[in-house]
């Protein structure tokens, strides 16, 4: 019997003992983070599925895992023998719709409220007939559960920061005043790290630390494991108006609040915290002020980001030169080797801290899984002709990077060249766009996809996401996807850092995705001044596209001009840094030649 099937049976026993008819297991921690500490990987524990997102529901008779289109193929394989069935999540098939349809008023739905988004609790109360019960049934089963992270917290040096934490706190308090609120609770780790100018190592790839922050009129309380903060840093925090409390004291402190207007962002707040509040507390639901403040990078941050992109670009030139030579020498290279070597070259930078996410290195048919991850148990060697997709990034003191490139192993065939060029056309289409400031970002996605739609091709993931500044590689509020709702918070603002990553995925054949990071930049000297401000996307990623995979007949003159200008900039910024690396310089020179 599968270990996961055994765990499901044990869970059902606990459900029966506690009169629970259905138990919902979310991919979440108390901060609703994208990447979770090992301690909070409940969904992985019960199902074995390690994708970045997914929701498990267990009843006495059935078990389901809902995942979106990125993970359908991967999840189908992993769930074999677990007794958990794959549910292909889309707009019509969600776990909330299943609960609404299948649970009755006399049944009880168990959920750990410490991991339940407040917004989801509200939705379930409205649409799910069953009674909700706060209960943790995973902890009793998980005997060898990892401990909570104990990594030290450190300062992000002021030379890299846009403002001091004292200044940032004042900016947030001004926003609070504008909203007529006297207290503000933040649980999202990137917001807290940005506001305090602190960083940590509690979550893989994201330099954040487990904490909550309660901002009052006269002080700010930082709830954190105090063993992670040395006495010198604590003194600095006190001088700037931040006072430490133990991480697990948050509920007790919230219970003390009374007769205050409390600002929260419901999509970034768990039900357990808000359910602990006194009835006299008036809750004001708005996006965290810090989210908009950190999303719009200022000129100082943008300058540092551009420096980080040079560091990353140099590492990539060295990496691709190594790969080219290894293939020419017929070395046996695996997808796992790609991951290791990319990290090795990035680590040569004095600014490097870590990778910014788990590298995706997929060869041929493996790249058809948009979020494929090679493992020691399942990986491919680069043995034959084909396409290798590499999606990788780094965390540097002066910025966060995220880039995807596709390179041929051997010689690309005509169909592969066609698909590569089509994705490049989509990439250039949105990269060349000029658009009104404050437009809802999801509306821009059609510009990207238009070249693909002309050939009745589409891809199942978003085109772009926000990126943090030495913070989370996936950051809001902007999102570039027509599948996302058009909301006030998704407006395009000057200074935002966003990814552009269209793709084509052909199951059993290959996957092609081409990704740059871009800065939302104001159009200077506009042709017309009567219609408000306009923005465009300025690429900051520095790495050439693969000209051997481009069918120049498919590109018009403006597309060629964009590509040549981009490659010219890449060469001019990277070549001076490669004087001591002749092989990397030769690799760069070959791929930045103008096309006609």
Regions found by a protein language model. Give the residues of each.
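Active-site neighborhoods and metal-handling regions in enzymes and metal-associated proteins
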Residues: 1-596
């Amino acid at each position: 019997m599968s270990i996961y099937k055994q765990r499901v049976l044990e869970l059902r026993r606990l459900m029966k003992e506690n009169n629970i008819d259905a138990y919902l297991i979310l991919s979440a921690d108390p901060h609703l983070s994208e990447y979770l500490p090992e301690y909070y990987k409940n969904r992985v524990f019960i199902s074995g599925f390690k994708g970045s997102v997914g929701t498990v529901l267990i009843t006495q008779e059935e078990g389901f895992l809902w995942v979106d289109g990125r993970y359908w193929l991967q999840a189908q394989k992993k769930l074999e023998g677990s007794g958990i069935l794959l549910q292909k999540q889309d707009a019509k098939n969600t776990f909330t719709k299943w609960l609404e349809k299948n649970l009755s008023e006399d049944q009880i739905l168990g959920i750990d409220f410490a991991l339940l988004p407040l917004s989801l609790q509200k939705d379930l109360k409205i649409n799910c007939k069953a009674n909700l019960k706060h209960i943790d049934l995973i902890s009793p089963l998980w005997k060898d559960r990892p401990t909570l992270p104990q990594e030290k917290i450190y300062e992000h040096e002021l030379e890299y920061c846009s403002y001091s934490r004292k200044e940032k706190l004042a900016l947030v308090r001004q926003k609070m005043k504008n909203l007529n609120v006297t207290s503000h609770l933040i649980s999202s780790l990137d917001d807290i790290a940005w506001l305090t100018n602190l960083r940590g190592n509690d979550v893989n790839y994201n330099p954040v630390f487990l904490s909550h922050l309660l901002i009052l009129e006269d002080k700010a309380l930082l709830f954190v494991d105090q063993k992670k903060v040395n006495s010198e840093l604590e003194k600095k925090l006190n001088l700037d108006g931040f006072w430490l409390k133990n991480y697990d004291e948050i509920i007790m402190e919230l219970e003390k609040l009374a007769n205050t207007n409390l600002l929260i962002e419901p999509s970034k707040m768990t039900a357990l915290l808000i359910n602990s509040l006194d009835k006299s507390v008036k809750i004001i639901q708005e996006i965290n002020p810090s989210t908009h403040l950190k999303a719009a990078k200022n000129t100082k941050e943008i300058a540092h980001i551009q420096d980080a992109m040079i560091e990353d670009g140099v590492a990539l030139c060295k990496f691709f030169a190594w790969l080219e030579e290894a293939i020419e020498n017929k070395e046996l290279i695996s997808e796992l080797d790609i991951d290791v070597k990319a990290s090795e070259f990035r680590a040569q930078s004095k600014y490097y801290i870590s990778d910014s996410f788990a590298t995706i290195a997929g060869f041929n048919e493996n790249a058809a899984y948009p979020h494929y991850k090679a493992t020691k148990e399942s990986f491919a060697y680069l043995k034959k002709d084909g396409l290798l997709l590499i999606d990788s990034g780094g965390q540097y003191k002066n910025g966060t990077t995220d880039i995807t490139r596709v390179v041929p192993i051997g010689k690309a065939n005509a169909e592969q060249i066609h698909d590569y060029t089509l994705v490049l056309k989509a990439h250039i289409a949105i990269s060349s766009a000029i658009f009104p400031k404050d437009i809802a970002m999801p509306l821009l996605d059609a510009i990207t996809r238009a070249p693909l739609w002309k050939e009745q091709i589409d891809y199942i993931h978003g085109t772009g996401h926000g990126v943090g500044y030495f913070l989370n590689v996936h950051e809001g509020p902007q999102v570039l996807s027509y599948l996302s709702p058009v909301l006030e918070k998704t407006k395009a603002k000057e200074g935002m850092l966003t990814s552009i990553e269209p793709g084509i995925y052909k199951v059993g054949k290959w996957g092609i995705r081409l990704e740059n990071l871009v800065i939302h930049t104001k159009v200077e000297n506009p042709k017309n001044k009567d219609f408000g401000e306009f923005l465009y996307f300025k690429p900051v990623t520095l790495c050439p596209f693969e000209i051997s995979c481009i069918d120049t007949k498919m590109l018009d003159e403006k597309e060629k001009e964009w590509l040549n200008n981009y490659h010219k900039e890449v060469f001019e910024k990277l070549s001076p840094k490669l004087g001591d690396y002749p092989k990397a310089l030769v690799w760069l020179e070959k791929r930045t030649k103008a096309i006609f």
